[in-house]
Amino acid sequence: MSENLKIYFAAPYSRAYVFAPGDQVLGKVVFDPKEDENVENIHVEFRGKYETRAGSGKEAKSFETTMFSIQKILFQGPFKMRASTYEYPFSFQFPKTFRFNPEVFDDDRLFPNEHRDGLQPLPPSCEDNGSHFSGNYRISYRITARIPRTFGDWSRETFLRFTPYRLELSPVPHPASSKDGRKHHRRYRLTDEGIPRPLTSNETLKEKFHHHAVNHTINFSLSASAPTAIVIGRPYAVELTLLSTDVETGHSAPEFQFSNYWLILNGRTIVRAPGIFITATSSLEEDITVGHGSIKCRLPLNKPLVVNGMFPSNPSYMPPSFSSFAVQRSYGLELKGTVSCLGEDSEFKIHWPRVTLYPARMEDGIEEAMKSIESSAQDMNLDDQSGLPAYEK
């Protein structure tokens, strides 16, 4: 990488921008030699590359393919360039598809392929973040500027974020309920004024051996409803319900409070690489905390409480749910929360095993796109919550 060679993108594009199929990639290469230099040429390459490694030890297999490579000459020499600043604009367009022969994989049962003519949709940019996994993957899109030199080229490389459009309403963004199956309880007594209070240490010890009639017990569990189709950056509401049948006894129940929470996406990635006799496959998992905080709000029994703000309002890039010929990405959702009662905390964990992360741009269109999907889903009376993103064929 050379310090006197840089890549800049035209507004509104930046390294954080999320490109989509057919988007223009506009920018410029800036060459800033500190002294006179002989330059053969200056060229720029726009390339999409797909790399996977699966298995371990002697069974490990690697696979890579260049989805596309577009090169342009920005300056043609040879020419002796004086110490100054030179700017060369470039323009590329993201392809919508690329040609690939899926027959290199001998088994399509895991990754069913609908594009038998060899035209594949571009998959979203993503990569394995750790070397400790048994498999690795990287789907990358990059702009590389280069000046050939006898003893090592000058170059500068910038990676771009890319995600395809979602074109089908499956799954629709309907919420789904789930609950922590564990039962929790609190023992308490009522004061002379009828106010619940925790048992003292001595009362708790005696209760273990013999139940006292003035002691009360309340059993409770937590249920939650959350969206199963998600765009990071859209402010979804989560509905919490503290469940208990003991309030029907007529005794005064203690007050509960929902305090700390963690909202986590459970990312699951299946990676494969072809071999001579067998295709190697690896499964990777990672937990991504998308929201956490402290709410400190009263949680009524058997009545839903709608909580806003758990999902982040500022979008960040994450690969959407997708299935391609060598990488498959899916998600689950997990909510961890703390419920406090009479000075004691209970930890809850609620899990939705399958949610879908929608692709969306970071700058605009998230709210409009989701409202359109929600409206269309209601009109069509859709309630299917399975499936993966569909791409234009």
Regions found by a protein language model. Name each.
Residues 1-393:
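C-terminal beta-sandwich interaction modules and adjacent acidic
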